[in-house]
Curated annotation (Swiss-Prot):
This is Probable G-protein coupled receptor 132. Changing residue 137 to A: Enhanced surface expression and a lower localization to endosomal vesicles. GO terms for cellular component: plasma membrane. Highly expressed in hematopoietic tissues rich in lymphocytes like spleen and thymus. Weakly expressed in heart and lung. Highly expressed in infiltrating macrophages within atherosclerotic lesions. Residues 1-42, 100-113, 176-198, 262-286 are extracellular. PANTHER family: G-PROTEIN COUPLED RECEPTOR 132-RELATED, LYSOPHOSPHATIDIC ACID RECEPTOR 5/SPHINGOSYLPHOSPHORYLCHOLINE RECEPTOR. One of its GO terms (molecular function) is G protein-coupled receptor activity.
């Protein structure tokens, strides 16, 4: 068990003390870090993610489910992403309580393992699903004609299931790790195995996905830029969307993965000098925790960029809101048959018709990524 002495400055000993010699780890295996330095920032950010992410992802899940039922391929990835985000957000209050309670976990080791498992799975499921979304858009835009007969919902479901299964298996060793009585997954003392794991996470969990996102979004914008049927404003809209996708990815995930890389590199540099490694990790503790927390902001940014920020989603939300107002009015106000017939054309017009000069009269609104003609691309991508 790790000790938990805390001084007035909020410094807490992490590691194994000589109190429990049965662990066969000497007392020098302790590092001193400050929990108080990051407490306020972590609580504020996690609280904001919970308050904003819950309604945003609930609405996103509903909107994308409607598109899934209409056989939309891209919506499958977005729906899976929103479900994963909702599962993670449901555990955020536990982290807030843990941090506010000076990093003391009172819910038992199994609850700690499940919560941590969901936390880390969500990070990498989100990253890989974002890559799937960008690749699907890339195929739908750059190879619109060639991919038309090859993009199927069944394929999207299979890929999403494989992503979730792969990440789940990679993180499954979490359940085999020993969890201390009062702590829940505090940073472990660096060793060669953990350093190698950090290198792999940086390479396959960040660097390669970043390359995929940058390449696909650049190619999408390049393809749109060459189109003669789009206005400058429409092209700029696609450009801003592509830049936003890569920027949010960098802001949310780059800091934490860079810290992982630095930690692993420091272990290699000090060549097993545990005192030096411990001192270095202690200095990085606050930064590491803040950057890990920052990665969860992705749970709020993704639904806004990919779904809620699109023109069609705003129209759908407006339609639902108008329909709700109409239903509420009919619930409390009884109208005569003649009155209903008189106002029916107006009600239908206000509720269900969304004039759009880009669509021929009587056409249906474009789905999220299904229609890929040059005239419809900006609406799909933005």
């Amino acid at each position: 068990m790790r000790s938990e002495p805390t001084n007035a400055a909020g410094n807490t000993t992490l590691g194994v003390t000589s109190v429990l010699q049965s662990t066969s780890v000497p007392s020098s295996e302790t590092c001193h870090v400050s929990y108080e330095e990051s407490r306020v920032v972590l609580v504020v950010v996690y609280s904001a993610v919970c308050l904003l992410g819950l309604p945003a992802n609930c609405l996103t899940a509903w909107l994308t489910l409607l598109q899934v039922l209409q056989r939309n391929v891209l919506a499958v990835y977005l729906f899976c992403l929103s479900l994963c985000e909702l599962l993670y957000i449901s555990t955020v209050p536990l982290w807030i309580i843990y941090i506010q309670n000076q990093h003391k976990w009172n819910l038992g080791p199994q609850a700690c393992k499940v919560t941590a498992y969901i936390f880390f799975c969500n990070i990498y499921i989100s990253i890989l699903l974002l890559c799937c979304i960008s690749c699907d858009r890339y195929m739908a835009v750059v190879y619109a004609l060639e991919s038309r007969g090859h993009r199927h919902q069944r394929t999207a479901v299979t890929i999403s299931a494989c992503v979730i299964l792969l990440v789940g298996l990679v993180n499954y060793p979490v359940f085999d790790m020993k969890v201390e009585k009062s702590f829940c997954f505090e940073p472990l003392r660096m060793n060669s195995k953990i350093a190698g794991y950090h290198y792999l996470r940086f390479t396959f969990g960040f660097a390669i996905p970043l390359g995929i996102l940058a390449f696909t979004n650049h190619q999408i914008f390049r393809s749109i830029k060459l189109s003669d049927s789009l206005s400058a404003a429409q092209k700029n809209k696609v450009k801003r969307s592509a830049i936003a996708v890569v920027t949010i990815f960098l802001v949310c995930f780059a800091p934490y993965h860079v810290v992982l890389l630095v930690k692993a590199a420091s272990f290699s540099f000090y060549q097993g000098d545990m005192d030096a490694v411990c001192a270095f990790e202690s200095r990085l503790y606050t930064v590491s925790m803040v950057f890990l927390c920052l990665s969860t902001v992705n749970s709020v940014a993704d639904p806004i960029i990919y779904v809620l920020g699109t023109d069609h989603s705003r129209q759908e939300v407006s339609r639902i809101h108008t329909g709700w107002k109409k239903w509420s009015t009919k619930t409390y106000v009884t109208c005569s048959k003649d009155s209903e017939e008189t106002h029916l054309p107006t009600e239908l017009s206000n509720t269900y018709t969304f004039p759009n000069p880009a669509h021929p009269p009587g056409s249906q609104p474009a789905k999220l990524g299904l229609l890929c003609s040059p005239e419809r691309l900006p609406e799909e991508l933005c």
